[in-house]
Amino acid sequence: MKLITAIIQPFKLEDVKTALASAGVHGLTVSEANGYGRQHGHTEVYRGAEYTVDLIPKIRVEVVADDADAAVLVDTIVTAANSGTIGDGKVWVSPLDSVTRVRTGETGSAAI
């Protein structure tokens, strides 16, 4: 099994959720994140004063998938999250040793 983690632009969340649902994903975790990549933040002007915003708001999406499905789901996320601008995000895949559904005790693929 794999844990797919994506950091995306907040305005792309609905597109990513819709695309993953169409790909057969029945569950995911979404959380707010702040960070920066190559863009290293930006500068804003408020009431005449200039401020450096070095942590940019992002959304973290996590999906657990079978090994065979991981590549397709990564492509699905990348396609849905792409706006063609700097800061679109990153997707990474990590090995997952086990998954257990708390309610039933099911493990492995049955718990996804």
Residue map of PLM features:
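Positively charged, small/polar-rich N-terminal and surface patches that mediate targeting and assembly
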Residues: 1-112
